[in-house]
C-alpha cells in the first residue's frame, strides 16, 4: 500500500523555489538561443534614444552662441610624411562669430518615422536589431562581415572620368562591382554603362572646393542610409582599395557599435577657435578627423546616430557653418557633436604620405593606396611590374601583384 509523503512548509517552499529557478533557467536559455538565431527583426529605436542625441547636439552649444560669421580660408593640409607623436595641438585660427547650432534642424519628421522607413527599405531586416545588443546581458558574437555588407563610395568629378575613374574600373572595381558606387557631378552614359548603373550624378558643383566636396559627401551618406548596408566606406578617386583586406578589417568590428575607422593626416588634433563678443575668452573646439584622401569607414550604428543631425542634406549646412571641407566636417560631427572617437587604422594611406615607404612585402596587409604628381615627381609605391611610362600611377602593377590572375597581368 502506497504511502503519501507529507512535506513540511519549509520543504514545500524549497521545492517551489527550485521549480521556479528551473523555469527561469529554461526561459533564459530559450531567449539566448532565439536571439542568436533570429536576433530582433522587429526592433525600433525609441524616440528618447535618438531625440536625446539630437537634443544634445543642439543644447550643448547654446551656451556658445555668438553673433556673426567671419569668413576665413580653408586650412591647407600639412605636407607628406607619417604623423609623429606630438603633444602639441594643431591650432587652426577659425574666428567664427555666431556659431549657432540651434538653427540646425534636427529632423523634419519624427525620428521614429525616419528609422521605420529605413528599416522598411533595408534589404537586411536584422540590421537595426544590433542597436540594442549592448543592453542585453548575454551579448552574442559580432556578426560576420561579408563583402555585400559594405557600401563603398568613390567621390569623383567630370574631369577625372577618363583618367582616375577609368583606372579604378579596370582594376579593383572588378572585385566589388555590386558594392561600389561612384558619386560625380555630371551625366556620363559611357561610364554609366561601364559601371552597370553605378555612376550617380549628385548635381553638385564641379571642382575641388569646400561646397562641392561637402555636397557629394552628403549625397554619399544619404544613399548609404537608404541602402541597408552595415558599413559605409568612403574613398577618393585616387585611391586603390584592397577589397579583400577591407572586408577582413571590418570583420574585426561590429556594425552595431559606433565605429569611426580611418587615419588622420596630421600629427595632433585639429583645434578651431571661436571668438565671442559676449565673453572675454575664446571658445575652442578640438577633434580628430580621418583624412578623406586615405578613405574611412563608418558603422551603421554610428550613421543612424548621424541621421537626425546630418542626414537629408544637413551635412552641407554644417560644412557651411564651420567652413571646412567634407572630411573635416565629418570628423566635427562624429568626434565633437556625437563624442565618438576616431579609431586610427594605419592601413589606410593617402597621397599626403610618401608612398615609397610602404614595403612591397606588406601590400596585402594594406587597405588603401594613393598617388600624386607634384613638382614633376610622382609620389607612388615602389612595386615591380609595368614600366613607368605604361603605369605611372603603379595601380596596374599593384593590382597584378595582389591579383595576378587578371588577363592584363604579365605571366609570372
Curated annotation (Swiss-Prot):
Reaction(s) this enzyme catalyzes, per UniProt: 3-O-(alpha-L-fucosyl)-L-threonyl-[EGF-like domain protein] + UDP-N-acetyl-alpha-D-glucosamine = 3-O-(N-acetyl-beta-D-glucosaminyl-(1->3)-alpha-L-fucosyl)-L-threonyl-[EGF-like domain protein] + UDP + H(+); 3-O-(alpha-L-fucosyl)-L-seryl-[EGF-like domain protein] + UDP-N-acetyl-alpha-D-glucosamine = 3-O-(N-acetyl-beta-D-glucosaminyl-(1->3)-alpha-L-fucosyl)-L-seryl-[EGF-like domain protein] + UDP + H(+)
GO biological process, one term: compound eye morphogenesis
Residues given in the record as Mn(2+) binding sites: 238, 351
Molecular function terms from GO: metal ion binding; O-fucosylpeptide 3-beta-N-acetylglucosaminyltransferase activity
Active site annotation, chain numbering: 327
Record's keyword terms, sorted: Developmental protein, Disulfide bond, Glycosyltransferase, Golgi apparatus, Manganese, Membrane, Metal-binding, Signal-anchor, Transferase, Transmembrane, Transmembrane helix
Transmembrane portions of the chain: 16-34
E.C. number: 2.4.1.222
InterPro entries reported in the protein's UniProt record: Fringe, Fringe-like_glycosylTrfase
Topology of this chain in the membrane: Single-pass type II membrane protein
Keyword Transmembrane helix: yes
Tissues expressing the protein: Expressed in dorsal cells.
Family per record: Belongs to the glycosyltransferase 31 family.
Name used for this protein in its record: Fringe glycosyltransferase
Organism whose genome encodes this protein: Drosophila melanogaster
Amino acid at each position: 500500500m502506497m504511502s503519501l509523503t507529507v512535506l513540511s512548509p519549509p520543504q514545500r517552499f524549497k521545492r517551489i523555489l527550485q521549480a521556479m529557478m528551473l523555469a527561469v533557467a529554461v526561459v533564459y536559455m530559450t531567449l539566448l538561443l532565439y536571439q542568436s538565431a533570429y536576433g530582433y527583426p522587429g526592433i525600433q529605436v525609441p524616440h528618447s534614444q535618438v531625440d536625446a542625441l539630437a537634443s544634445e547636439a543642439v543644447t550643448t552649444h547654446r551656451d556658445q552662441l555668438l553673433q556673426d560669421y567671419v569668413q576665413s580660408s580653408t586650412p591647407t593640409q600639412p605636407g607628406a610624411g607619417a604623423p609623429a607623436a606630438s603633444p602639441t595641438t594643431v591650432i587652426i585660427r577659425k574666428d567664427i562669430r555666431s556659431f549657432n547650432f540651434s538653427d540646425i534642424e534636427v529632423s523634419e519628421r519624427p525620428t521614429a518615422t525616419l528609422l521605420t522607413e529605413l528599416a522598411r527599405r533595408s534589404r537586411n531586416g536584422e540590421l537595426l536589431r544590433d542597436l540594442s545588443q549592448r543592453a542585453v546581458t548575454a551579448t552574442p558574437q559580432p556578426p560576420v562581415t561579408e563583402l555585400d555588407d559594405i557600401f563603398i563610395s568613390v567621390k569623383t568629378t567630370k574631369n577625372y572620368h577618363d583618367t582616375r575613374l577609368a583606372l579604378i574600373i579596370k582594376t579593383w572595381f572588378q572585385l566589388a562591382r555590386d558594392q561600389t558606387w561612384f558619386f560625380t557631378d555630371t551625366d556620363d552614359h559611357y561610364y554609366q554603362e561601364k559601371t552597370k548603373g553605378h555612376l550617380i550624378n549628385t548635381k553638385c558643383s564641379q571642382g575641388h572646393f569646400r561646397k562641392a566636396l561637402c555636397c557629394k559627401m552628403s549625397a554619399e551618406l544619404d544613399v548609404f542610409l537608404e541602402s541597408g548596408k552595415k558599413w559605409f566606406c568612403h574613398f577618393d578617386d585616387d585611391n586603390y582599395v584592397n577589397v579583400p583586406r577591407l572586408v577582413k578589417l571590418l570583420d574585426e568590428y561590429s556594425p552595431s557599435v559606433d565605429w569611426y575607422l580611418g587615419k588622420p593626416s596630421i600629427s595632433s588634433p585639429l583645434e578651431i577657435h571661436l571668438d565671442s563678443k559676449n565673453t572675454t575668452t575664446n571658445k575652442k573646439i578640438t577633434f580628430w578627423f580621418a583624412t578623406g584622401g586615405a578613405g574611412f569607414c563608418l558603422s551603421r550604428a554610428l550613421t543612424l546616430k548621424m541621421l537626425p543631425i546630418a542626414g537629408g542634406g544637413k551635412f552641407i549646412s554644417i560644412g557651411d557653418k564651420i567652413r571646412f571641407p567634407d572630411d573635416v566636417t565629418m570628423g566635427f560631427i562624429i568626434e565633437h557633436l556625437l563624442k565618438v572617437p576616431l579609431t586610427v587604422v594605419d592601413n589606410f594611406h593617402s597621397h599626403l604620405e610618401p608612398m615609397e615607404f610602404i614595403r612591397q612585402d606588406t601590400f596585402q596587409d594594406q587597405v588603401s593606396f594613393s598617388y600624386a604628381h607634384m613638382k614633376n615627381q610622382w609620389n607612388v609605391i615602389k612595386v615591380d611590374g609595368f614600366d613607368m611610362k605604361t603605369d605611372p600611377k603603379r595601380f596596374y602593377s599593384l593590382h597584378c601583384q595582389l591579383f595576378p590572375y587578371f588577363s592584363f597581368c604579365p605571366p609570372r
